A protein has these predicted regions:
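C-terminal helical cap/extension that packs against the catalytic core
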Residues: 186-196, 201-205, 298-301, 307, ...
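Beta-strand->loop->alpha-helix junctions that form or flank phosphate-binding loops
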Residues: 183-184, 198-218, 240-244, 274-280, ...
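Charged, amphipathic alpha-helical linker segments immediately N-terminal to NTP-binding catalytic cores
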Residues: 1-8
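Nucleotide phosphate-binding/pyrophosphate-handling subdomain across enzymes
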Residues: 119, 124-129, 137-147, 151-155, ...
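ATP-dependent carboxylate-amine ligase catalytic core
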Residues: 8-14, 19-29, 55-141, 157-159, ...
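A conserved segment at the C-terminal end of the G1
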Residues: 36, 44-61
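Acidic, Mg2+-coordinating active-site environments of NTP-dependent enzymes
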Residues: 103, 125-128, 147-237, 251, ...
């Protein structure tokens, strides 16, 4: 399975997913969907949209990956994780089918999610891609709206080494005669989306051309955000419980997506939208995005794991804790661009190198050696929680401890 093993488990075609779903009666055709792709921000965007839709009264499915603690995090309806009995029954019922098709773990979970949403008769489901878009297992749906949050460097061994190549894979979720929202715009990739949309008679909506963040202030566990609608020249004052400042980009994408949903007939009052954005964690169970779990010293969990994601959390650390001694509990998986990620970290910080207990994890000894070549020094730990305890013992009351680098590192925190 890709989650634990990595690129070796990735399959570059939709054959297995199509065969699985056809055998199940194509459950993905029995509910409306929104498809979300992007290098960073697709999980946050998916959760925000799901929160808004369910708060507006729609029975809302949500499929995301990977999970942090429990498998059920991947498949939710109105924030509630999939019933364990359904999972057990699904695996038992499809045993003969899976023996024949031999799907990957991800392919099987996609089919399971689609059948669960169909069985439970959701009104709509927000479906996050696993990797890329064009050949991702989720890309057998016919969404009413496609969303691409941004394009950055990640999974280059699979998606391509250039931003246009990566964009070309993400653009594959744009569908014929279907609106598509593009979050961040890069001059080098914009034409990729325009060309794909033209070929499919899809209408593109660029969030950055419609919305602009005028004011941004993280305060405790909330992010205060003023967003200007450039079309109506009005400003909406929002409070987000997803309080990483990088969420400002995502919220513009979400607002643009909600406008398209309203145009499609979905009734989403402004007050409902505002309340949902303030309670995303409560409504959808989202975790791992700038979670401040302690104040003195500050302890923050974030699943940031690539160059763009790490840049964002380091910027917020610098602005939120300008005088603090920084401590980093770090662990990565083998297929990440660790060398370039480590170039971003301050050399005067304390480091605690560790690894999750999965085959795909980069051993902490190897991570420590790479870091030493970058001028970053610290100790190595076999266990994530041992690394955290070491950081807590050394950190002063006014220091800040950042735990990041992988979903799996966050998942092993006790």
């Amino acid at each position: 399975m890709f989650t634990r093993i990595g690129a070796a488990a990735y399959k570059k075609d939709l054959h297995n997913t199509i065969e699985l779903c056809e055998a199940l009666g194509n459950p993905q055709n029995y509910f409306q969907t929104i498809h979300v792709a992007g290098t960073n921000g697709k999980g946050s965007t998916s959760h925000m949209l799901a929160a808004i839709l369910q708060e507006a009264g729609y029975k809302t499915g949500l499929y995301t990956s990977p999970h942090i603690k429990a498998f059920g995090e991947r498949i939710r309806i109105n924030g509630q994780m999939i019933d364990e009995t359904f999972v057990i029954d699904f695996v038992a019922r499809t045993k003969e089918l899976t023996s024949k098709v031999e799907p990957s773990f991800f392919e099987l979970t996609v089919a399971m999610a689609f059948e669960y949403f169909a069985t439970e008769a959701v009104d709509i489901a927000v479906i996050e891609t696993g990797l890329g878009g064009r050949l991702d297992s989720t890309n057998i749906i016919s969404p009413i709206l496609s969303i691409i949050t941004n394009i950055g460097y990640d999974h280059m061994n699979i998606l391509g080494n250039t931003l246009p190549e990566i964009a070309g894979q993400k653009a594959g979720i744009i569908k014929k005669d279907t609106p598509a929202v593009i979050g961040e715009i890069l001059p080098i990739t914009k034409n990729i989306f325009v060309q794909e949309a033209n070929e499919k008679d899809a209408i593109l909506h660029f969030a950055q051309s419609r919305y602009q963040v005028e004011y941004l202030e993280p305060t405790g566990n909330l992010l205060f955000c003023h967003v200007k609608d450039l079309q109506t020249n009005t400003t909406e004052k929002l409070r987000l419980d997803l309080n990483g400042i990088y969420q400002a980009k995502n919220v513009c994408t979400v607002l643009c997506a909600v406008e398209q949903l309203r145009a499609l007939g979905y009734k989403i009052p402004e007050a409902v939208q505002q309340n949902a954005l303030e309670h995303v964690k409560e409504l959808t169970g989202m975790r791992g995005r700038w979670d401040i779990v302690q104040s003195h010293p500050a302890i923050i969990h974030d699943v940031a794991h690539n160059v763009d994601g790490i840049k964002q959390v380091l910027y917020q650390l610098k602005t939120s804790y300008p005088n603090a001694q920084l401590h980093f509990v770090l662990g990565f998986v083998k297929d990440k661009d660790v060398e370039h990620v480590l170039d971003l970290f301050p050399k005067n910080a304390f480091f605690y190198f560790t690894n999750a207990h999965i085959p795909r994890a980069l051993p902490h000894e190897e991570l420590r050696n790479i870091a030493a070549q970058k001028g970053l020094t610290g100790e190595g730990f076999d266990d994530v929680n041992e690394a955290i305890e070491a950081a807590k013992k050394l950190a002063g009351e006014h220091d800040a401890i950042m735990i990041c680098g992988s979903f799996f590192i966050i998942g092993e925190i006790q």
